């Protein structure tokens, strides 16, 4: 951090354009509180800038990629939230995504797609024959494995195609590519890594698993068959089942059982992704959907979480829209159970704050404490929309009056009125927090 760091933040505050994008690395052990205060003040303006990155976790991510510590210190955010080593790291980030909502659906339908009615995945057994929750969880894990095997195979094909298409302009920005006359596409960088494999639907997975565990197996409030019938009907005529699903414990509320399940599932996912290697190295996991949670949701029917068919999946590591009811602190505690350092492509947390919070007298101090808590808990990233929901709804109805309204979508900022309606609806539906606690 130096004088230019403050100047860049001030320029962003004064100009308020959606490009160029702006991210900050913050290290509690190294950077002064005055810098954190300036970050908080700019965030409160509501432009979506800057995106905030926990420097210590960023370094850990580079170490987990095999980068030596003396160079990992020089990491930088690139793209949306991906971790990069400028001029030295070859890795196609966010190369392929896999759908965790589909994994749950396929486990409930023995490999079939609810939307298309075809066998879309492998058969993992009739769920009505499962005698324990563990059998159901294993079926979901096998569906995730199946998805990942296909995803990685597709990534390898893309690598083979890319190997035949050199990129000399890009290669000129890599020291070793120039020194050794070896193109970036051929692995000419100093550090060559497997491509990014990114999960979409974190909260959909966890909320669905815990709902089945509680409602079907632990408390026996509903049979598996009745749950399946309710999902087939998109809960129409099964409002009692919908109510039970909605009231089941939810990711993002610091529930101990949900937190433990989150840690277990995402250690499993990281382990499995890292078990695959390309010609450039082991594959690298991430959780950064950009806005892919919206089109991915169009492929997934109703889920045990209570989510209705074809609606957007949860974005990044954020809770499902409207289900985080215990405040921003509880969200952080839940998210901290994901091993962020192992998802070394990057992880993305969107937070929507009401203008009521921004206008409160202690908001800057409270936001600074929130960001410190994020760092202490080992969460990698967060970014904010500071706006009230009614303004977004009005902008959707009367776009001509809101041409300059900036929002943070995922790893990028955009003019709200230029977004598709589905993405606008997704942003509107996010929980709006009026306080930190």
Question: Which role does the model predict for each range below?
Answer:
Residues 1-437:
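Conserved catalytic cores of very large enzyme subunits
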């Amino acid at each position: 951090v130096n004088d230019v760091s403050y100047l860049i933040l001030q320029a962003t505050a004064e100009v308020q354009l959606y490009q160029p994008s702006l991210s900050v690395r913050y290290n509690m052990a190294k950077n002064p509180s005055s810098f954190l205060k300036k970050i908080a003040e700019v965030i409160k303006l509501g432009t979506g800038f800057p995106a905030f990155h926990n420097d210590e976790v960023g370094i850990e991510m580079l170490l987990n990629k095999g980068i030596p510590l003396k160079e990992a210190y020089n990491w930088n955010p690139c793209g949306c939230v991906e971790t990069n080593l400028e001029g030295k790291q070859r890795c196609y980030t966010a190369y392929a995504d896999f759908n965790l909502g589909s994994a749950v659906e396929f486990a409930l339908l023995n490999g079939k797609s609810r939307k298309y009615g075809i066998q879309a995945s492998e058969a993992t057994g009739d769920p009505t024959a499962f005698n324990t929750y563990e059998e159901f969880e294993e079926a979901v894990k096998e569906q995730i494995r199946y998805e990942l095997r296909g995803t990685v195979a597709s990534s390898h094909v893309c690598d083979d195609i890319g190997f035949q298409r050199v990129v000399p302009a890009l290669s000129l920005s890599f020291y070793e590519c120039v020194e050794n006359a070896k193109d970036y596409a051929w692995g000419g960088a100093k550090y060559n890594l497997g491509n990014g494999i990114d999960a979409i639907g974190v909260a959909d997975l966890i909320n669905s698993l815990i709902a089945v565990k509680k409602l079907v197996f632990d408390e026996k409030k509903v049979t598996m068959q009745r749950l399946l019938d309710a999902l087939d009907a998109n809960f129409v005529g099964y409002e009692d089942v919908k109510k039970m699903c909605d009231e089941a414990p939810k990711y993002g509320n610091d529930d101990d059982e949900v937190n433990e399940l989150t840690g277990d599932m995402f250690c499993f996912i990281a382990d499995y992704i890292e078990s695959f290697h390309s010609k450039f190295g082991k594959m690298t996991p991430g959780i950064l959907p950009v806005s892919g949670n919206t089109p991915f949701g169009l492929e997934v029917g109703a889920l045990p979480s209570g989510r209705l068919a074809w609606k957007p999946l949860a974005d990044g590591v954020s809770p499902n829209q409207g289900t985080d009811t215990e405040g921003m602190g509880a969200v952080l505690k839940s998210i901290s159970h994901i091993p962020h350092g192992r998802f070394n492509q990057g992880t993305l947390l969107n937070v929507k704050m009401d203008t009521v919070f921004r206008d409160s007298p202690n908001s800057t101090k409270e936001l600074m404490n929130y960001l410190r808590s994020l760092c202490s808990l080992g969460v990698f990233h967060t970014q904010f929309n500071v706006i009230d929901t009614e303004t977004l709804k009005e902008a959707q109805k009367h776009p001509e009056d809101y041409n300059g309204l900036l929002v943070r979508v995922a790893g990028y900022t955009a003019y709200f009125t230029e977004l598709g309606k589905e993405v606008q609806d997704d942003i509107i539906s996010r929980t709006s927090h009026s306080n930190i606690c």
